[in-house]
Amino acid sequence: MSNRFAVILAAGKGTRMKSKLYKVLHPVCGKPMVQHVVDQVSQLGLQKLVTVVGHGAEMVQEQLGNVSEFALQAEQLGTAHAVDQAAGVLANEEGTTLVICGDTPLITAETMEALLQQHKEAGAMATVLTAYIEEPAGYGRIVRNENGHVEKIVEHKDANEKELAIKEINTGTYCFDNKALFASLSKVSNDNVQGEYYLPDVIEILKNEGHIVSAYQTEHFDETLGVNDRVALSQAEIIMKNRINRKNMVNGVTIIDPSNTYISADAIIGSDTVLHPGTIIEGNTVIGSDCEIGPHTVIRDSEIGDRTIIRQSTVHDSKLGTEVSVGPFAHIRPDSVIGDEVRVGNFVEIKKTVFGNRSKASHLSYIGDAQVGEDVNLGCGSITVNYDGKNKFKTVIGNGVFIGCNSNLVAPVTVEDGAYVAAGSTITENVPSKALSVARARQVNKEDYVDQLLNKKKS
């Protein structure tokens, strides 16, 4: 196999997005558009990848890191001009170069591989990825000669009446013989309505020089959708969401209502897990097998063990063990580690806490900056008082501890193994192992007080 290279065009300003965020960094199913493209082209066995950047270059470089080299298009003068900015990296290389736009997040490695194979089998100097659509307005048209070969590509704004009737369109993805590509770029003119240097003109240049120009017509037009505004962004989101949901269902995940379930592109979900409506799985979340998630649950960048149930709750940047029960209406905040067979009940908030195996906080509790041992019971209304207005402090609760209802543990404080804390206590000192700590005022009953009070009011 000959050397393979790729150029991703990501220098457009994206003015139609009307956004401060660089266009190709707008997310689709939780991942920036350009990252989707990079992830797919990286499966093609490339020797070099060059991303052409312009406005917002630093943000794109930060997103992609060292998986790509970068070339700067300081002034946007057209797609041919953009590709030419990669000459310093690629111009002298032997091989095949794929050119693709960074705002086409739906393109797949399979389609690009088919394009490359067509290019090789045809012995072509250039091959165009095309599609046939009923409403081609706005797209460049593929003009073929009497032999069916690609003669040229005409931009919509420059097309005559006959050319506008053509329904085979240019998707904006190509592959070229690398040296032929860079040799032809200097011959491209900007003599057109827009005054720009069009990459499709390279096709006509190569054809006029007697080279073979081939085309691969994809059946999956939706893969070629370019995102230039918020409407197209929403369309891409829907298509990608459906693709991700279908992939998970094929792999054994039950999604009760796919139209109302959102899964990020990088999430991994085990078989026989059930997702109820309103479930949102974000980021690099990993969910085990035989889980039940939702309804109306958000999980972000977290790891969920097998046979765990999460209902109407939120989990962020945390790790949950196996056979955990969460919710309804619980909130597990970042940097929490929840052990196996744990119960986190309704209106319980856990933050930056290690919560041991088989421990329970079943109702109305806040556990923050804490280390909770195994087999602990936190009664309704248990609170770790971790903040003094300036600093956060740690609470340590040992194994087998029982915390009575409506108790406050004022950190820094330790409740040692096997200790009991009486209901209604405010604990400000360490509790020894197996001790009972009572920290509340003694009850006083005043006999006949109510009658005396009422009689006093009457007099």
Swiss-Prot record:
Region (N-acetyltransferase) residue spans: 252-459
Region (Pyrophosphorylase): 1-230
Pfam families named among the record's database cross-references: Hexapep, NTP_transferase
Binding site for acetyl-CoA: 386-387, 423, 440
Catalysed reactions, semicolon-separated: alpha-D-glucosamine 1-phosphate + acetyl-CoA = N-acetyl-alpha-D-glucosamine 1-phosphate + CoA + H(+); N-acetyl-alpha-D-glucosamine 1-phosphate + UTP + H(+) = UDP-N-acetyl-alpha-D-glucosamine + diphosphate
E.C. number: 2.7.7.23, 2.3.1.157
Binding locations of Mg(2+): 103, 228
Presence of the UniProt keyword Glycosyltransferase in the record: no
GO CC annotation: cytoplasm; membrane
HAMAP family hit by this protein: GlmU
UniProt name for this protein: Bifunctional protein GlmU
